[in-house]
C-alpha cells in the first residue's frame, strides 16, 4: 500500500508496439511473462503510486494488460514520444504528480523512484516541475553506446543537455570526468506535463530522438537525481538475453 502523501501520484507506462530499434520488444517473452507485463507488475509492486496504467495504441499490448488484470488506457492519437502519449491519458485525471515509466524497464528500483518523488516534498519543491534519474557510467562501451543517453548537469544538478554522444567531450584527456547515463524515468507535475504536450518538437529533440530535450529547448529546468542502481532497459535482442539471465 502506498504511504500517505499530500500529492496524488500515478505511474503511466507508455507502450508502443512498433519500436524502431526492436519492434515488438514489449511483447517478447521474459522468463514466462512479457516485457510489458513485467514492467507493469514491477511498478505496482513498488507501492509508491495511487494508480498504475499502461497507455498504448496497440491492441496486442492492450489485451495483454487486460488479461494480466492490469489497468490500461488506449491512446486516441499518434504521438511522437511517450510523454505526449501519457499527457493525452492524464489530461482529465485528478492527479498531482505523473511518473513516466518506460515500458522496456522491467527492473524498476523502488529506492531510486522514492528519491525521485521525494524532490517534490523538499524545501523549494514549488520551483521544480520535472525530475529524472542519472547513474554513473564507467565502461567505455557503455559510454559510447548511442542507446545509452548521456546527461550533463550543473552544480545544482539541473540538466544542461542530453545526448547519445559521449558528453562532455574530453579535449584534455587527463581531465577527471564522470559520465552519466540518463535513466528514462520522469516525474512531472501534471501542469508541467501538459505544458510539455502543447509545445511543438524542435530540431534538437528531432535530431537526438530524446524527448526531454524539448523541455530544455524551451528554457525549462529538469532536476536530476543520482542513483547508483544500474538501469536494465531492453533496447536490443542482446539486452533481452541479459534480462533473461538476470531472472534465471
Curated annotation (Swiss-Prot):
It holds the Pfam family CTP_transf_3. GO terms for cellular component: cytosol. One of its GO terms (biological process) is lipopolysaccharide biosynthetic process. Its EC number is 2.7.7.38. Keywords: Cytoplasm, Lipopolysaccharide biosynthesis, Nucleotidyltransferase, Transferase. It comes from the Bacteria. It catalyses: 3-deoxy-alpha-D-manno-oct-2-ulosonate + CTP = CMP-3-deoxy-beta-D-manno-octulosonate + diphosphate. The keyword Nucleotidyltransferase applies. Signal peptide: none annotated. Its main location: cytoplasm. InterPro entries: Cytidylyl_trans, KdsB, Nucleotide-diphossugar_trans. SUPFAM superfamilies: Nucleotide-diphospho-sugar transferases. Pathway: Nucleotide-sugar biosynthesis; CMP-3-deoxy-D-manno-octulosonate biosynthesis; CMP-3-deoxy-D-manno-octulosonate from 3-deoxy-D-manno-octulosonate and CTP: step 1/1; Bacterial outer membrane biogenesis; lipopolysaccharide biosynthesis. It is found in: Cytoplasm. Activates KDO (a required 8-carbon sugar) for incorporation into bacterial lipopolysaccharide in Gram-negative bacteria. Belongs to the KdsB family. PANTHER family: 3-DEOXY-MANNO-OCTULOSONATE CYTIDYLYLTRANSFERASE (PTHR42866), 3-DEOXY-MANNO-OCTULOSONATE CYTIDYLYLTRANSFERASE, MITOCHONDRIAL (PTHR42866:SF2). HAMAP family: KdsB. This is 3-deoxy-manno-octulosonate cytidylyltransferase. The gene is kdsB.
Amino acid at each position: 500500500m502506498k504511504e500517505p502523501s499530500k500529492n496524488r501520484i500515478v505511474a503511466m507506462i507508455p507502450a508502443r508496439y512498433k519500436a524502431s530499434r526492436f519492434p515488438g520488444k514489449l511483447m517478447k517473452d521474459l522468463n514466462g511473462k512479457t516485457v510489458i507485463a513485467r514492467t507493469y507488475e514491477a511498478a505496482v509492486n513498488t507501492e509508491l503510486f495511487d494508480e498504475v496504467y499502461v497507455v498504448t495504441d496497440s491492441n496486442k499490448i492492450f489485451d495483454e494488460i487486460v488479461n494480466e488484470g492490469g489497468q490500461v488506457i488506449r491512446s486516441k492519437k499518434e504521438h511522437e514520444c511517450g510523454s505526449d502519449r501519457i499527457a493525452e491519458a492524464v489530461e482529465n485525471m485528478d492527479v498531482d504528480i505523473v511518473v513516466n515509466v518506460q515500458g522496456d524497464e522491467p527492473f524498476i528500483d523502488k529506492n531510486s523512484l522514492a528519491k525521485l518523488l521525494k524532490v517534490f516534498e523538499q524545501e523549494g519543491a514549488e520551483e521544480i516541475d520535472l525530475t529524472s534519474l542519472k547513474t554513473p557510467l564507467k565502461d567505455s562501451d557503455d559510454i559510447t553506446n548511442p542507446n545509452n543517453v548521456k546527461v550533463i548537469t550543473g552544480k545544482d544538478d539541473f540538466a544542461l543537455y542530453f545526448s547519445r554522444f559521449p558528453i562532455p567531450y574530453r579535449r584534455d584527456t587527463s581531465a577527471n570526468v564522470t559520465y552519466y547515463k540518463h535513466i528514462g524515468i520522469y516525474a512531472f507535475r501534471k501542469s508541467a506535463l501538459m505544458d510539455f504536450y502543447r509545445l511543438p518538437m524542435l530540431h534538437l529533440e528531432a535530431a537526438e530522438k530524446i524527448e526531454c530535450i524539448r523541455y530544455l529547448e524551451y528554457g525549462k529546468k529538469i532536476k536530476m537525481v543520482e542513483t547508483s542502481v544500474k538501469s536494465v532497459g531492453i533496447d536490443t535482442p542482446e539486452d533481452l538475453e541479459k534480462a533473461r539471465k538476470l531472472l534465471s
